[in-house]
Amino acid sequence: MMAEDRRARVRALLDAVRAEGRTALTAPEGKVLADAYGIAVPGEELARDVDEAVACAARFGGPVVMKIVSPDILHKTDAGGVVVGVEGAADVRAAFCRIVANARAYDASARIEGVQVQELLPRGQEVIVGAVTDPTFGKVVAFGLGGVLVEVLKDVTFRLAPVDADEALSMLDSIRAAEVLRGVRGQAGVDRWAVAEQIRRVSELVADFPEIAEVDLNPVIATPEGAVAADIRVILAAGAPKERRRYTREEILTSMRRLMQPSSVAVIGASGEPGKIGNSVMRNLVDGGFAGEIHPVNPKADDILGRKAYKSVTDVPGEVDVAVFAIPARFVAAALEEVGRKRIPNAVLIPSGFAETGEQALQDEIVAVAERHGIRLLGPNIYGYYSTWQDLCATFCTPYDVKGGVALTSQSGGIGMAILGFARTTKTGVSAIVGLGNKSDLDEDDLLTWFGEDPHTECIAMHLEDLKDGRSFVEAARATVPKKPVVVLKAGRTAAGAKAAGSHTGALAGDDAVYDDILRQAGVIRAPGLNEMLEYARALPVLPTPKGDNVVIITGAGGSGVLLSDAVTDNGLSLMEIPPDLDRGFRAFIPPFGAAGNPVDITGGEPPTTYEATIRLGLEDPRIHALVLGYWHTIVTPPMVFAELTARVVAEFRERGVEKPVVASLAGDVEVEEACQYLFERGVVAYPYTTEKPVAVLGAKYRWARAAGLLGGGS
């Protein structure tokens, strides 16, 4: 069927259903959609009475499945409206009567159109293919193990719809039971292409018709010969969602450039009185060394911190790039009108007292003012922002000026301050720290678009509680990930789960499950916690990009080697199978009671020369792509001796063009802390008292390299 013809056919059907005031399609109506989009379903007919049911069953010539058809009964099994394996005229008659009686008992007011008589499919692997409308990401397609246990097993994966054939196939390998589909215990695998086609076509259907809220094919019977949907359920949305205003990439970059690289900043509510937010913002801007113009705005002052104060922002001479608000929430809308008349493109709203306290109307008002004047809003309810390469500290919190390549954002002020403390403690250089707060306008996809192009930014780490527009974020992430890593800490992993849903797919699509799969699809590295997000952010720019999958562990302690091996496996990395010649090479440097293999156990009492020789061999051999070092504190090789020799050898090889990621776990007394800091500052990611953290960082680097297309195997 031609694309235009099938869309016209489906459009006519959906309009008719809407005209009747219904949101659920009947099974025969679902078959119309399936046929239009090439979704394989069994032969079936609608029987309006007993005699028609007998005739239908006779035409199929074998056992049949019989199902109630009612626009008012969504879950047919719950209503006793499904009978499987019916054969013979007498049984068909009895089943028809029983199904109708059960349906009337279930819902006496239900409209009953008849009974669907469907050919019985052969036994096979039951899977579910579906689609839901996610509040964050829009149309999302789902795949997993199906049948009656689908909501118990919850072995399901999600992708943004529509998907192409390759993405659909990748979903088959993304569930825990992936091997079942390939065939286990002598059973043949399923026709993977046929299953993937069901996924692709469902995704195409919901992308073409936004009013379709949910689609369920459950179960799909998958066999070596094909994949057929035994049941199809379609639910329509009650109303169209509100469209969010979208900005072009060029518009975002133009606005963000003036926000992050301003020449002139006005502080509305600036104060000369210590303890006031307006004073703290002014003090940070002035003391931070910002080279641009700083204009305090306060109708009651003539001079603030040596700067001329203005009664209104409209009195400020020349262009202004950013207006920072440090006034109570109730005065923001009026002041924002003046910002609009001044044609200032960006407003940074520090005040709280908006939607986060229930004052949604007040927030809606400032958004309307901003949209009318073309102002982009950062906030409200934020600590401000730092743009270190501009010496810009527009915040009422403690200043920070250590320049570097890490851009950090947070939706929460408390998390923002944790970011600041971590950066200071670890001496992490940052390109920016930005608070997002209520995200009335500017959000993560705007910042991601900017940081993706910012030459000062090498890694982006974002704390978020939600995304206003998941598709825009994914679009920005896909454009950024090939150039630099994006790390996300998504809060609310254990939030409530699925709301009441009309389909199995809807019940399975809990917020976090969808976030997890789609962030991975976008190439984003998801951090399990705040510390991991911060450690990934500071460590990923330090590590060179691996050129292959072979990881070798060199350790001075067997126990650490076992734990490091576990961590390698847990992080999806590959321990190299050591070939005989390399095994002989390592054995030449370690005592007879040591162990080559992988891990290479040099034992704890070895001198610095053994560490150096084995590390050199690991860096020299081109078959090895990454090193994990396990150090055990001994007087023979003190921590700083180990750190200095490791840093020296790694630097020597990098000067020769051999750049491999090297991470280290240091076990010992407190001296290992200084040794780790020394190594970190010299390009070896090292942590004391943990075997998990250095390998987790290496795993994150590998995930990014795959997502960026620098290694095979996907993300």
Report residues per predicted region.
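Catalytic-core regions of core metabolic enzymes
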Residues: M1-S715
